[in-house]
């Protein structure tokens, strides 16, 4: 399966709005038992999450996984830091990329692949306000063109 395929559980739509994504990597997650059950139920939010490299390992911060309803006292902390599983070469590439000014690691989507939870992280460079406006203008123009084309097709 190519990168990003599988049952998508959660997407970080804000990431494509706030960053220019240059490269993506698929990473596994180190989870507890009740966390994977909540993820399979789709109770996860990637909106404010980010990845950080600490002591040569990659960690995912602020990913909210809701507590499992039947988890009682064995439930997990919803915002705990989770370790990402990547190859050493990939981690060294990420270290090199994030040392550059303005680059950061952003989780793009969380999905299930062959029963395992995977996260697609991207190396992103932050957009300026005028870049965001430009993207919105392009999107609106594209929508208008499609609408005009669709209306023209209806006439024939």
Swiss-Prot record:
Q: What is its main location?
A: cytoplasm
Q: Which keywords label this protein?
A: Cytoplasm, RNA-binding
Family matches, as Gene3D superfamilies: 2.40.280.10
Biological processes annotated in GO: trans-translation
Q: Known SUPFAM superfamilies for this protein?
A: Small protein B (SmpB)
**Molecular function terms in GO for this entry?**
RNA binding
Location of the protein in the cell? Cytoplasm
For this record, the Gene Ontology CC terms, alphabetical, are:
cytosol
Entry superkingdom: Bacteria
* InterPro entries assigned: SmpB, SsrA-bd_prot, SsrA-bd_prot_CS
Write out the function statement from the record. Answer: Required for rescue of stalled ribosomes mediated by trans-translation. Binds to transfer-messenger RNA (tmRNA), required for stable association of tmRNA with ribosomes. tmRNA and SmpB together mimic tRNA shape, replacing the anticodon stem-loop with SmpB. tmRNA is encoded by the ssrA gene; the 2 termini fold to resemble tRNA(Ala) and it encodes a 'tag peptide', a short internal open reading frame. During trans-translation Ala-aminoacylated tmRNA acts like a tRNA, entering the A-site of stalled ribosomes, displacing the stalled mRNA.
Tell me the NCBIfam families matching this sequence.
Answer: PRK05422.1, smpB
Spell out the family assignment given in the record's similarity comment: Belongs to the SmpB family.
Instruction: Tell me what this protein is called.
Output: SsrA-binding protein
Origin organism of this chain?
Bacillus pumilus (strain SAFR-032)
Classification of source organism: Bacteria, Bacillati, Bacillota, Bacilli, Bacillales
């Amino acid at each position: 399966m190519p990168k990003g395929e599988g049952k998508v559980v959660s997407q970080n739509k804000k990431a494509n709005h706030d960053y220019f994504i240059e490269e993506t990597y698929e990473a596994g997650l180190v989870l507890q038992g009740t966390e994977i059950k909540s993820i399979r139920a789709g109770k996860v939010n990637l909106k404010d999450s980010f990845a950080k490299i600490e002591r040569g390992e990659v960690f995912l911060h602020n990913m909210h996984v809701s507590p499992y309803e039947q988890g009682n006292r064995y439930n997990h902390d919803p915002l705990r830091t989770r370790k990402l599983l990547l190859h050493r070469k990939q981690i060294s590439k990420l270290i090199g990329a994030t040392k550059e000014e303005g680059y950061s690691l952003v989780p793009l989507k969380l999905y299930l692949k062959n029963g395992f939870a995977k996260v697609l992280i991207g190396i992103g460079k932050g957009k300026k306000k005028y870049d965001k406006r430009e993207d919105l203008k392009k999107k609106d123009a594209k929508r208008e063109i499609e609408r005009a084309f669709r209306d023209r097709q209806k006439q024939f």
